[in-house]
Each structure stands twice: as structure tokens, then as C-alpha cells.
């Protein structure tokens, strides 16, 4: 149930994010979620897109450094404590979350959270056992 996430190396300079998103738009790539982690010189742009393979090919053809990482997507109630419950389930199983970011869903009352863990299979099993629903790549783009 892993989701393919695109990671793009981004130099910290004006216009770089615009360049990346323009390449994706030109190639009909739909961005559903993104997160930027930065340092003083560069950042990592993480994206959930409708066609990860084509996105990476398009970015690389423009000389950009891009790769695919497998992450998990979970559905949480859009209410106080919804995320805390899912994270506690992982913590209780000694699974560390390397990073996470959330975005809205077309489903009223829920949110999607992307999480990066060391062992997707183990985390999936633990989350499912606790009644936490996982999502697949195609689910993210259903209207």
C-alpha cells in the first residue's frame, strides 16, 4: 500500500520552485500535496503527483535531480487528536516517523497524512491492526 512520492533537490534561489512546477504543469502532472524542507543553501521538495514516473522523467530531462521514495498514506479523522492517535500507534510499536505532511481530502471529516517510516510493511500492518485506514496512490486522485 505504499505511495510513490517524488523528491526534488531545490537550490534556494528565487524562481526555482516556479521552474519545477512549470515543468510539471507542461507535462500535465497534477500535484496533490507538497512539502518543502530546507537549509540555508538548498531544500528538498516532496510531492505527491498523479504520475510519479512521468514527473521524474520530465524533471530529469530539464536537468533537475529527482527521485521516487515509497511512503505511506493514512486517513485520519479531521478532528483534534486524529493524528495523535495514529502517531501513538506507531510510537508504541517503536516505529519512528522520519517526516509527515497532511492535506485535505474530498471526503468530508477526514484528512490524508503522508508518513515516511523505515519499514512500510511493518508500519502498515501495525496501523491496519489498530483500525487506521491506509490509502493508495489512486485514492488520492479520486474526485
Place the predicted regions along the sequence by residue.
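A conserved regulatory-domain signal marking ACT and ACT-like small-molecule sensing domains
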Residues: 1-143
